[in-house]
Amino acid sequence: MEQASVPSYVNIPPIAKTRSTSHLAPTPEHHRSVSYEDTTTASTSTDSVPEVRIRSESSQVSRESPPIRASKAFVASYEYEAQKDDELNLPLGAIITLVTVETNEDGWYRGELNGKVGLFPSNYAREVTYKDNLVEFKQDEIMLPVAVRTLSDCQIGHGATATVFKMDIKIKKELQNGRMGEAVGDQMKAALKRFNRHASNFRADVVSTDEQLEQLKREANLVNGLSHNNIVRLLGICLEDPYFGLLLELCEGSSLRNVCRNLNSDAAIPLGVLIDWATQVAEGMEYLTKQGYVHRDLKADNVLVKEEVCLCMDEEMFQYAYCLKCGKRPFDKLQLKITDFGVTRKMTADANRFSTAGTYAWLAPEAFKEGTWSEASDVWSYGVVLWELLTREEPYQGHIPATIAFQIANKGQNLSIGDSCPDRWKKLMQDCWNLEPNFRPKFSTLAISFKQYAKEFKDTHLQRAPSKMAVKELYSECFADKTKEEFEKRFHDLYAGSGDINRKNRHSIAPETKARRLKHHKPKKADITGPTEVKHILSVQKDDKNFRVKTYDQSSTGGTLPRLNERQSTLSLSSPDLFHISNLISGSNTVGHSAHRISRKNAIRHKKNQHRMFESPVVSPTMDDSNTFSTIDNADEVDPNHSKESKKGGTLSRAWAKLPWNKRDSKEDHDERAVAGSISSRSSSTTSSNRLITGQTTRGASAAGLLEIGARSRAQSTADGWEDPNTTKKHKVSPSDKRPVKTTNQTERYVKDLEKDTPLRPAQLPPTHRKSALDQTIPASPNSPDSINNFHPMPLSSRRTTANSSSDGAPCYDALVSHSYGAGHGHKNHFGLSDTIPLFPEEPTHYDMGPGRPFGTNGRAIVNQGGDYYGNISGQNYEGFGHGRSINQSTQYYPVGGGCDDYIPIVQKTVIKPTVGEVGNSPYSENIRCATRNVQNPQYIQCKKNQNPRRIPALPMKIQSESNLVTSGMVFTPRDEQLNGIGNSLSSLSLNEPPDIPAPLPPVVTYPIPASLISPSNRVSMSPPTRMAPVLPLGAMSSPRIMDKEILKNSSVEGTEIY
């Protein structure tokens, strides 16, 4: 071997344990198969080779120190294709010289093949000892028998692939000690199986002489070394013409099939003899299975008889070793040999014996359909051999063979031979024909069973005649014409689609290749080093992120937590800001720095730019006195059954309460409000269904009255809240109240998600939102026309309404109003929570309603059309505080929902002019404007349309006083947005039917107005309608856009200072 062929490294692991060779024996026709035990647990073929693990460099040694060679050889039992450069390609039957078993790869040996040294899987090769080395014979060492002149005269068998001759061979040293048979002098008898070159059993039809020689050697190595009394042994090979072939152990008694068929039909073979024959075949197959062989063509024709058979059938001769009449062996003394496995396999065999019908008779269904063989498939064939021995018939002769076997297997009976057949024999055959391969017995079990069977029937001599008669009856029953078509159909269903049998396409199950993993062996003392010095290694990294920590930075506009890299905060932000919070203890109304600050745990914390679920981005003011929370006398009742329901769903409720936003609402809001005495309009009014719609009406000329409504409503609600603390409250009045709130779909939480984009805000506003107290004065925008003179304040009933929701989803504040006479007239125009609200001396007692007029498609009233329409004020001469109108001017009432049954007037266009510089980018259309909408902080203008209006039911609003009648005329034009109320997509009420909601009588309220200004002409007498059917024309414009248009046209409106 050349030095260059040695790999650059050799791994030296501990000695690998001895590999079991029970699964390494060769398989016929270029392939091997594992034992039956392996096939039931593993089905990995050589086509899916596991990933090979690369060895570490620490296990490599220098090429200058080659390993010590071992004097052993291995024969490749399976074909293996190298997966790495340091591995060997293993052709089937190749002889591998073992280099060493000491590799660092578990299950891998190092060997030499064709001058190359490399690794090979140990379970793909079988060890060959010195005595099993293949013996080669020369041409002159093979001789014809004495009385034979030509080779054809000594022919004893012929097949499509090979011809068998009876020859004399010279005894060699390796064949001494009588291992192969009787020897006469220096010669012994042998069978020469010479292959036909034109139809050889190799992979190609035409191969070169060198290739034939090499393949013959490899395939001879597969069966070499097998030694068993029931296995035909290989004596050697001859590589020279005319004796090119294999030299096998000679069996002069022909095949077991011929023995059974040559007997007289009237002669019966004793059952004890049949049991002995079945035992020998089972023991021979058990040995092959342990050596890793799968026969794949087991039948009576491939079971040979060692000696010539006595056909005298004289039972008296059974007590002798040889027949006294013919000198041959009696039946009970025959030695059976299994042959025709390995390379001697015939591709087609004789035409009559290896036809399609003959093959199906012994072939297991799974082997034919799937093309894989195992011990279980040989067991199936063994059952057919038992049937041959008992019946001495060709199985399924004249018919498709596997049909009967399959049909009887489905019924639980396979080739039953009648009541006269021993039940034990019958059961053994049926077990071999189990359709499930895993349920078939093994050959070792069969051998033991027949040995026990032989002991039981040692003295029993059952004749064959009764059994033969039962078999004949079986044939006549099974092959009747009426059932033949059914049997053929069953056979077609079993074997159809598998194609013709082709042994070149057959393959056996190869063992799984072990992954090349490094062995972990126990370390030696020399490998253990002494103690080393202990070192503490610290990793220091330069800060390139400009990390800094802010500690109580009062110049910061954000929260109080440190920020990394000056990023936008994703943490929580204090609200109120701990750096900009008023002195709550001293009761200051101004926002600024104070020596007294609340603790951080009492502050409301909100995610910056990450609003909580159903949370409005605009929060109500949070600063007021400690008496902020109050009961609402006419709020919706809490469902008395809710407590029972919450008990049933307690697990879900508790889980929902543990969510982050719920925790903050229940704990942090409660702590902050309890200490600071603050309140949000959302938490104090969500229980009420009496709501006013919100919008931009707080910024126009008609907004003053509605702004006053909010202040009066808040004050009224607060005053109503003083009650006995021991009285059980039925409504939620503060965040600390743990009772459930009856929510509606029109709350600010619900409509928050409808605003996808941040609304536009007017100029000159603070960069960030600052919370304001309920009683704190919020200055108007420089361009705001909120200051209105000559507008009488409009009172509202004590029913609390939600002041922070709007029909278009716009967030808003509660009313912050001015006096009807303007700034500085009369009294403080925003009452405090503790102020006494004076009453007006007079109040209207009834309403007079008159016929109205419908609206056209352009929003203008239709004249000269008959019919009365509900919601129209009768034409009376009225002069109110504000702009005048004609005596016959009628006002269309438009329903606005929000939880109360109020209406607002819609009047025709007259004289309102906007202040110069008023909002110039207002997107609202022209022509008409609703008289009132709900309150909104005048610092903000909601300019974004609601892109996703929701269908929210609402009730109309009733008029409480004649001061509600705004005298400005307006014209109604289309707008894309929707208003809550009857006749729009947000209302569940119909336009065609008047609502059954009567307007309740207004409350008694005293107005603080000079008596000189009050006259009978300033009042309008109306009767409350019983049914009102307001009409919103198609394509009409919503009220906020109408009002904005009127504001822009009113040049006489001046700014208002709000206290």
Swiss-Prot record:
GO cellular component, one term: cytoplasm
SMART domains in alphabetical order: S_TKc, SH3
Domain SH3: 69-130
GO biological process, one term: response to starvation
Post-translational modification: May be phosphorylated on tyrosine residues by svh-2. May be ubiquitinated and targeted for proteasomal degradation by E3 ubiquitin ligase rpm-1.
Superkingdom of the organism of origin: Eukaryota
Modified residues (Phosphoserine): 355
Active site: 297
Cofactor dependency: Mg(2+)
UniProt xrefs under Pfam families: PK_Tyr_Ser-Thr, SH3_9
Residue interval(s) of motif NPQY motif: 937-940
Ranges in a coiled coil: 199-224
Disordered: annotated span: 1-66, 617-699, 714-808
UniProt GO MF annotations: ATP binding; MAP kinase kinase kinase activity; metal ion binding; protein kinase activity; protein kinase binding; protein kinase C binding; protein serine kinase activity; receptor tyrosine kinase binding
Function: Serine/threonine-protein kinase which, by phosphorylating and activating mek-1, plays an important role in the activation of the JNK pathway composed of mlk-1, mek-1 and kgb-1. Involved in the response to environmental stress such as heavy metals. By activating the JNK pathway downstream of tyrosine receptor svh-2, plays a role in axon regeneration after injury.
Self-association and partners: Interacts with max-2; the interaction is independent of max-2 and mlk-1 kinase activities. May interact (via NPQY motif when phosphorylated on tyrosine residue) with shc-1 (via PID domain); the interaction may facilitate mek-1 phosphorylation by bringing mlk-1 and mek-1 together. Interacts with svh-2 (via cytoplasmic domain). Interacts with tpa-1.
Family classification: Belongs to the protein kinase superfamily. STE Ser/Thr protein kinase family. MAP kinase kinase kinase subfamily.
Protein name, UniProt field: Mitogen-activated protein kinase kinase kinase mlk-1
Organism of this sequence: Caenorhabditis elegans
Phylogenetic lineage: Eukaryota, Metazoa, Ecdysozoa, Nematoda, Chromadorea
